[in-house]
Amino acid sequence: MAHPHLLAERISRLSSSLEKGLYERSHAIRLCLLAALSGESVFLLGPPGIAKSLIARRLKFAFQNARAFEYLMTRFSTPEEVFGPLSIQALKDEGRYERLTSGYLPEAEIVFLDEIWKAGPAILNTLLTAINERQFRNGAHVEKIPMRLLVAASNELPEADSSLEALYDRMLIRLWLDKVQDKANFRSMLTSQQDENDNPVPASLQVTDEEYERWQKEIGEITLPDHVFELIFMLRQQLDKLPDAPYVSDRRWKKAIRLLQASAFFSGRSAVAPVDLILLKDCLWYDAQSLNLIQQQIDVLMTGHAWQQQGMLTRLGAIVQRHLQLQQQQSDKTALTVIRLGGIFSRRQQYQLPVNVTASTLTLLLQKPLKLHDMEVVHISFERSALEQWLSKGGEIRGKLNGIGFAQKLNLEVDSAQHLVVRDVSLQGSTLALPGSSAEGLPGEIKQQLEELESDWRKQHALFSEQQKCLFIPGDWLGRIEASLQDVGAQIRQAQQC
């Protein structure tokens, strides 16, 4: 086998060649290529005239000497038009019921069937066998068919509870296409002189029959790690809980896993990675409503769980809570404690400063910063005499915020532990302490836990950076995952600075 990274590079170059001259169809081409390389089927949904047939025609050039068959279904289509006419000679001379399949679906590697839902039962039943078993019954004989890719297309979905659902379930990849949207792309499409039927793929990039057969075996050897299976099972359970979620058969899950294995294989990896699960957004939907729902659920999975984002945030929350507990314990030890005086029969409890507090101006530190008078305050300066009078008689108390400017009126109180507490307009409080009595920096326990968490974050981010080199995943999804990881990292760093 070629070096995995060389294979990934080759498939990327092959896809780029197939995409030439097709505007805003890169994702569709890449997924159709992935389907062709893994022997799966694709359904293209969209209005007429948006290059659905051209996509299928292009895929023929991915393979050396591949044969293509395409057909536009109508209500009057017959099996002869798809699978080949009956051999009059065989019927006349030998009494054999046999079709002449040369040039028809049974001998084609790439098949495109437009307006698929207009096919009649006779065509559908034979087509189901062809998709499921890659076999075609020709008279008394069962023949293997070489079909590598079936692309079915329509401008509508099959009716619910119709005989078409069995065929629809066989279409593993489902893509919703629309007209060219970008102005520059639209102009390029209008002015392009490229012959759409020319082969854009160099012979050196085309897949040989031997390579294709070997790859089918090697795709099956790609492993499904436990943590990736857990993500898949989490998604399945979540979908089962949602009343509007589409029904996903066990067969579809099974086929989807092989597609994920193929994605990993052609990305140069030996195991399925969480990033491959994004492909499920194009496999599990049924209609427009379920398309949005599936994308939402996979987005939650990718940005919240696939790289342990939510788990790391939960750990961070526990660490922050523990830090707050330690801060509270430290506050109780280091806070300025005033002395309660007699005054049993007085209306107001009286206090005085400790005897060791003798400075004429006291600078007291806030155990946690507060916003007071539109200023972020970390310490307050009091005149000792003013503070003593307030402790004894109550009334108004003023202090200089951060030791600057005029003294400002403060909401100060003595709590049940005889500590001075200043409150902001929302009544959030901060205990006051003498300089030098407040703990400096993070406690060792908290610092170690945050360092371990940051180390785990770096590992997850490195894993994502390595896995995101995947041709088949759209860049906007990778961007959202990167943003979710960066958000977790920023919160960890912020906690380390507290």
From Swiss-Prot:
**By which gene is this protein encoded?**
ravA
What's the protein name? Answer: Regulatory ATPase RavA
Pfam families named in the record: AAA_lid_8 (PF17868), ATPase_RavA_C (PF12592), bpMoxR (PF20030), LARA_dom (PF20265)
Q: Does the keyword Hydrolase apply?
A: yes
Q: What are the recorded GO MF terms, alphabetically?
A: ATP binding; ATP hydrolysis activity
Enzyme type, top EC level: hydrolase
Q: Which NCBIfam families match?
A: PRK13531.1
- Report activity regulation: ATPase activity is stimulated by ViaA.
Q: What is its main location?
A: cytoplasm
The cellular component terms of Gene Ontology attached to this UniProt record, alphabetical and capped at eight, are: cytoplasm
Residues annotated as binding ADP are: 23, 49-54, 196
The record lists the organism as Escherichia coli O17:K52:H18 (strain UMN026 / ExPEC)
State the source organism's domain of life: Bacteria
Q: Which SUPFAM superfamilies match?
A: P-loop containing nucleoside triphosphate hydrolases
The catalysed reaction is:
ATP + H2O = ADP + phosphate + H(+)
**Protein family membership:** Belongs to the RavA family.
Q: PANTHER family, alphabetically?
A: ATPASE RAVA (PTHR32204:SF0)
Keyword annotations for this protein, in alphabetical order, are: ATP-binding, Chaperone, Cytoplasm, Hydrolase, Nucleotide-binding
Any idea where this protein resides?
Cytoplasm
Q: Which residues form a coiled coil?
A: none
Q: How does it assemble?
A: Homohexamer. Interacts with ViaA.
> Briefly, what is this protein's role?
Component of the RavA-ViaA chaperone complex, which may act on the membrane to optimize the function of some of the respiratory chains. RavA functions as an ATPase.
